[in-house]
């Protein structure tokens, strides 16, 4: 069987490079005034965050596929080895199907699945808070919070696999960014009434 994880792995490498290029561009982006976005040019830093957001989403999605393919290959090899090394030939280890591995929700597959699901769960409040903060408070501040949020989301697959409370290293900063941006935007909106 061909190594099916090569396609998603190559996409992961390309997306990681794109994410790094966007981050480098954002780091070199200077001269953005503080305060609410007044035109499209002042939204530049936020647009870079949105580009990185899409790259990270697809990176997590391709990682989810690559993980399922590699776990499937590993479990098939283990089943084959168990069948060929069993004494007397009576034990016949059945290799799991790709669907059983992909939707079984165990081990590395569970971590990859949760990384995608958690990212998607956090997407609506993050995007709303990011854009409201940029429009009502500060585009550069929204971009800074956006980069922190993306960093917190990026480490989720790694900390999810660790014992609790490691996952809080990802979730708490992300919640904090969303809460801060949204609270500041709501305060700015209310103070203008």
What residue ranges belong to the model's regions?
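Small-residue-rich segments of transmembrane alpha-helices in multi-pass membrane proteins
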Residues: 13-18, 171-185
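Transmembrane alpha-helical segments that form the membrane-embedded catalytic/substrate-channel core
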Residues: 54-72, 152-159
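Juxtamembrane boundary at the C-terminal end of a transmembrane helix
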Residues: 29, 182-193
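Short alpha-helical packing/oligomerization segments
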Residues: 130-151
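Core segments of transmembrane alpha-helices
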Residues: 13, 117-130, 178
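Cytosolic, membrane-interface loops and tails of multi-pass inner-membrane proteins
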Residues: 63-114
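Interfacial loop-to-transmembrane junctions
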Residues: 154-179
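Long, highly hydrophobic alpha-helical transmembrane signal-anchor segments
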Residues: 2-65
């Amino acid at each position: 069987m061909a190594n099916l994880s090569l396609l998603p792995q190559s996409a992961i490498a390309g997306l990681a490079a794109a994410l790094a290029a966007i981050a480098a561009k954002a780091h070199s982006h200077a001269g953005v005034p503080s305060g609410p976005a007044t035109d499209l040019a002042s939204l530049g830093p936020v647009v870079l965050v949105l580009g990185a957001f899409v790259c990270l989403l697809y990176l997590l999605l391709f990682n989810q596929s690559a993980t399922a393919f590699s776990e499937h290959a590993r479990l098939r090899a283990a089943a084959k080895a168990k069948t060929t090394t069993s004494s007397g030939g009576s034990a016949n280890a059945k290799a799991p199907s790709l669907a059983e591995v992909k939707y079984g929700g165990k081990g590395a597959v569970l971590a990859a699945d949760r990384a995608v699901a958690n990212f998607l769960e956090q997407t609506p409040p993050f995007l709303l808070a990011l854009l409201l903060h940029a429009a009502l408070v500060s585009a550069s501040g929204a971009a800074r919070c956006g980069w922190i949020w993306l960093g917190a989301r990026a480490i989720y697959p790694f900390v999810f696999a660790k014992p609790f409370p490691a996952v809080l290293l990802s979730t708490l900063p992300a919640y904090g960014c969303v809460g801060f941006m949204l609270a500041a935007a709501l305060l700015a909106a209310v103070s203008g009434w």
